[in-house]
């Protein structure tokens, strides 16, 4: 079992398999010219899988595949099957923008994937084009339906932005509700690599908008979950992720592995260690020791929760993994 110095059980591993993405979302990607980490510098699926086995054997019970956009990496379903075959009852999930799901949803399900979190910030084609910087909405919505048809559980992630989709929050909630999917509204997380003068809505502003149509009641927060849960009178539940609040970190159970092999204890801290050499050499003992070292580096709270309201991440989110 993995337990950090604050007594939190860490049983959730988020793995970024690529930095690359087929979107250029304004709140994620840099506005200035940048280059991807060369493919030859990324961990192979075999190297990633070696660390996955170490993590599972140490007590990890949940794995989420992220990017970039994970589906742009070739043979992702093969990697998912490797994990599923090793630990069939592992909680195995994927975060995606949904664009490529019409082609991959069934293959992912057959490989052992159980759940998908899908980004959907708007139901308006022009707004979607503005955020992603390409026409995407038709394919994204088709991907949502393809995932449901394949038998995957789908949760929607919506970044709530002032003057952009604040007039759509109720429509997005109803879109998810009528399709028996949960939606989570995410406060915009500032990072120094994506500056578009975007302003996020705070959790109380999101609740105020939804409460104009629905009676909203605070529900019990799920253990280790980052989202605060709210319930409508008909029983439908939705979430709000607010990383600025103190309790966002108090039960954090996750660590992150970047595509190039950096094991990261927290999205907003830079105390990462590389497992690249260990897994390239097939050194399970060294990989396990690095895992323990990173666990020891895991902070009690992120910088926002510590009071740094204007803090931004110095590492771009597409590099760390969503």
From Swiss-Prot:
Cofactor: binding details: Binds 2 [4Fe-4S] clusters. Binds 1 [4Fe-4S] cluster coordinated with 3 cysteines and an exchangeable S-adenosyl-L-methionine and 1 [4Fe-4S] cluster coordinated with 3 cysteines and the GTP-derived substrate.
Keyword field contains GTP-binding: yes
CDD domains: Radical_SAM, Twitch_MoaA
Chain positions recorded as S-adenosyl-L-methionine binding sites: 27, 68, 119, 189
Top-tier EC class: lyase
Binding site for GTP: 14, 64, 95, 155, 254-256
UniProt EC number: 4.1.99.22
Binding site for [4Fe-4S] cluster 1: 21, 25, 28
Catalytic activity: GTP + AH2 + S-adenosyl-L-methionine = (8S)-3',8-cyclo-7,8-dihydroguanosine 5'-triphosphate + 5'-deoxyadenosine + L-methionine + A + H(+)
Cofactor(s) essential for the protein: [4Fe-4S] cluster
Pathway: Cofactor biosynthesis; molybdopterin biosynthesis
A Pfam family it matches: Mob_synth_C
Residue ranges of the TM segments: none
The Radical SAM core domain, residue ranges: 5-226
Record note on quaternary structure: Monomer and homodimer.
Main function: Catalyzes the cyclization of GTP to (8S)-3',8-cyclo-7,8-dihydroguanosine 5'-triphosphate.
Protein name per its UniProtKB record: GTP 3',8-cyclase
